[in-house]
Amino acid sequence: MLSFIYWAFSDTFFNWLFPFSSTGKGPWITVEGVAPKYTEPYVSAMYKSKTCLDYEVDSQMSPHKVPTYHGLSLDVKADPKTGHFQAKLPFNGGGWCKWKINQAFVSVSYTDVSHLVKDAVNEGGDGTGLTAFINNAAKTDDKETVTLNTLDYRPVIYPILEMSEGFPKRLFVRGEVGTCFFQLRLTPGAEWRIIYKPRLDETKIPKITITNGKGEWVEYPDGRIETGTQTVDFRYIK
């Protein structure tokens, strides 16, 4: 009974009554781009609440309050002819917890790789793309590119073929980094945009080979071979 009373008057209960909503909670961040042929886009975001808090125990076993988070994934479809896609992420998620956007994610991944290697499978998952830390969101380090109101990212990406002994051949797309990080600062009243237009170059396919006990190596399109590694060095692709 006491646990029910506690729940009924907690943030969890009121968040259940007045949940996150992505409808009509402008202003909006417009996300647009072009997904290369044989790929599909993904757009999602993480929202943070400083109203609804949770407890966390530190290394000294002392409890302290921390913010809570809510994830939002959008159903985004690219135009089958042009690859163009567009979506809108709400800045506010509303609700009892007063959600505000903290991070935005945009990426592309393969849907079909049979045109490159017939017996390979596509990786699926999040593919390659960008993460935008919004305003004062906690960053991974100090190396993020800082942009104001509009983030425009147009990398060259490549297919990577992974041949691991005992597993099917695997093809996935990558840029120089799996995810590029940005700090996106938003000015009230301005137009907010995230643009992601990768160019897929399928003329160059690095190959990763992983064996059981016979080593591992990466072979580059020009014939160069780097042994003892599974990491592709993009300096050798261009």
Give the label of every model feature segment.
Residues 19-20, 83-84, 164-168:
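Short, intrinsically disordered, charge-biased short linear motifs at domain edges
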Residues 41-156:
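Structured domain cores in non-transmembrane regions
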Residues 13-30, 37, 57, 231-237:
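Beta-strand-rich domain onsets/edges
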Residues 1-11:
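Hydrophobic membrane-insertion alpha-helices, especially the h-region
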Residues 25-29, 39-41, 83, 102, ...:
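Residues at beta-strand starts and edge strands
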Residues 31, 101-109, 198, 230-234:
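Short, hydrophobic/proline-enriched secondary-structure or compact coil segments at domain edges
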Residues 32-34, 46:
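Residue-level recognition of well-ordered beta-strand positions that form the cores
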Residues 122-238:
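A eukaryote-biased signal for long
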